[in-house]
Structures are given as structure tokens and as C-alpha cells.
Amino acid sequence: MEAITTNGITLRRTVAAVQGEDALRAMGERIAGALGPAVTEWAITRGELTLVVQGSDIVYALTYLRDEPACAFRCFIDICGVDYPQRARRFDVVYHLLSLRHNMRVRVKVQTDAATPVPSAIPVFPAANWYERETYDLYGILFSGHPDLRRLLTDYGFEGHPLRKDFPLTGFVEVRYDQDEARVVYEPVKLTQEFRNFDFLSPWEGTDYVLPGDEKTSS
């Protein structure tokens, strides 16, 4: 058991946790050394290794992580997007990989903007196909070299990308089935409701009957 004191708070970590972090640190140093300037930074966060990679080098980095025996990150888990509107390159594209051989996960991040496409990961991991379509649909992030980059979750003709921070919570249109026209119709969002007059001054009258068990408190 190892004890670490931070701001007066003592945290104790098991030997397994310490050894796991040491293995992650060694893996991070190995990958950063092998990929060189392709990796701009790396860190260990919540027991997982996180790499930040240049967008133009993402295919090269993913290929190394998959094929290098010391890494063997061959399980492609997911791709997701993150939106930071205050940044010039507002989007993070995050790749999640798993190595069954080393019982280790790695998170690879690429920064981009709405106009700069990220090279598609399909040549390395074919399963990236639908993940990239989903990321494009929800964030508007472009992927160059994708064979069929079109929306996946939203409807035909949908405007905007719903997981961007500047997308309104209500959306732009509402969808309903019109009984008279016997079809689905799209209309502008309407949040108005009928005027309601709330009476806050009348006292609560309660009930005029006794519920089972209440007779004990009244007596």
C-alpha cells in the first residue's frame, strides 16, 4: 500500500494500482518515443493512457498502436466527438482502443475545426465506418477518405448538428404525424402554451377522512 498526501488529504493506492500506472507510463513513453512529433502530448488520466496526436498523423498512429507487438491495441471500441466552442480548433475526435494482450486501454485525441477534415480510420479499423458517420452527424466533423460520409442517426434533411454546444436544446423543427394529411409533417418549434391562472392564496383544505394509521397520531 502506497500513501500519497495532497492538500492535507492522504490517499492510499494498492500495489496493483501503482504497478498498473507504472505500466501505463512505460507504454506512454514507448509510444511517444516511437511516433515522435506525431504525439504532441500524453498523460495518464483515471487509470487510462491519453495521447494527443496531430490530425494528419492519425492513420499512422493508429496503425502503429494496432501492429506494434508491444502495444497490440487491436480492439477498436469507439469514436466520439467533444465540442469546445471557445477554442479555435473547437472539436476533439476521440478514439478508444483496447489491448487484450496487455489488459490496457488507450485514448487517442485529435483536434480539428468544422472546415478541416480528419483522415478516416477505416483503412486501419473498418469498424470506424459507422462511428465516423455518427460523429459527422452529431458534430459536423468531416472525415476525408470516408466512402459514404452521410448522416446516420438524424432524419433526412435535418438541419444542424445536435451535439454541438451552440445547437438549441429545442432544435429547429418538431416532427408529428398529421391525421388529416396522413403523413409526417415538419413544423417550426412552438413552445407557447395557453394562459394559466394559478391560485396561490387559497389555503390547503386537506381531506375530511382518516387514512389507516392516522388515527394513532390524532389521538
From Swiss-Prot:
Bilayer topology annotation: Peripheral membrane protein
Role summary: NDH-1 shuttles electrons from NADH, via FMN and iron-sulfur (Fe-S) centers, to quinones in the respiratory chain. The immediate electron acceptor for the enzyme in this species is believed to be ubiquinone. Couples the redox reaction to proton translocation (for every two electrons transferred, four hydrogen ions are translocated across the cytoplasmic membrane), and thus conserves the redox energy in a proton gradient.
Catalytic activity: a quinone + NADH + 5 H(+)(in) = a quinol + NAD(+) + 4 H(+)(out)
Gene Ontology molecular-function annotations: NADH dehydrogenase (ubiquinone) activity; NADH:ubiquinone reductase (non-electrogenic) activity; quinone binding
Organism: Methylorubrum extorquens (strain PA1)
PROSITE patterns: COMPLEX1_30K (PS00542)
Record keywords: Cell inner membrane, Cell membrane, Membrane, NAD, Quinone, Translocase, Transport, Ubiquinone
Gene Ontology cellular component list: plasma membrane
Record's keyword annotation contains Ribosomal protein: no
Subunit annotation: NDH-1 is composed of 14 different subunits. Subunits NuoB, C, D, E, F, and G constitute the peripheral sector of the complex.
Main subcellular location of this protein, as a coarse class: membrane
High-level lineage: Bacteria, Pseudomonadati, Pseudomonadota, Alphaproteobacteria, Hyphomicrobiales
Gene encoding the protein: nuoC
Record-given protein name: NADH-quinone oxidoreductase subunit C
PANTHER family: NADH DEHYDROGENASE [UBIQUINONE] IRON-SULFUR PROTEIN 3, MITOCHONDRIAL, NADH DEHYDROGENASE UBIQUINONE IRON-SULFUR PROTEIN 3
A UniProt-annotated Pfam family: Complex1_30kDa
Entry superkingdom: Bacteria
Sequence similarity: Belongs to the complex I 30 kDa subunit family.
Subcellular location: Cell inner membrane
UniProt-listed Enzyme Commission number(s): 7.1.1.-
NADP in keyword set: no
